[in-house]
């Protein structure tokens, strides 16, 4: 039994911190700031910001019917956890010229929770 417990402990320690700490309910609460401008539903419409349904694996600036900035359209980003976290930490600093007027997510735990929620809500 001790060997199994040790293997489990090693596995948990090797998991990325974001995966260990992610709380989708807290992420949904964090998304409250985002849903003023974004929807996540499959048939959701674009608001001030684009619909985020299916965002992971999608090329940035590619939602039909949304008027993106040239910076976003030409960024070459395909959204994954790293690119999303980098952008959401400092939207204006990470992509000068984009339109998103959001100061950024400043805390790692909030970011992990938000990403976990987005993965769940945007599939």
Predicted stretch roles:
Residues 6-16:
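Bacterial N-terminal signal peptides
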Residues 1-5:
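Positively charged n-region of N-terminal signal peptides that target proteins for export
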